[in-house]
């Protein structure tokens, strides 16, 4: 299995973020942790055929025309998924139970976080088909390799 590449970009000035995007050769997804210059950043990412993921705000993802949203695990994921329509829903989970519940709610990918993130990702890929990634520690078995810009 070839790992996809999931890029995470911290908040920064518009020029800095756009410069980082310009240097990307290829990636599957781009999560921007900021809230400034979102339309311009989204357009630059999508122009490279990379999925633009909004952090923690489903309504904003819809408004911007993003490709998805990544949210922390919480009750009400089915409602978020229904509101998103075709947009991807990524859910940050730190336990097996959270991940299974997120999968049942329709998550398109699971992002494991916490000190056991890699261990949880290995467990997940052995049992489930929903893609996963490990935010906290690298995991070669996960569907996506995470790189911070």
Show the residue positions of the predicted features:
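Active-site/ligand-binding-proximal alpha/beta "capping" segment
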Residues: 108-149
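Conserved N-terminal beta1-alpha1 strand-loop-helix module at the mouth
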Residues: 1-75, 82-108, 130, 139-141
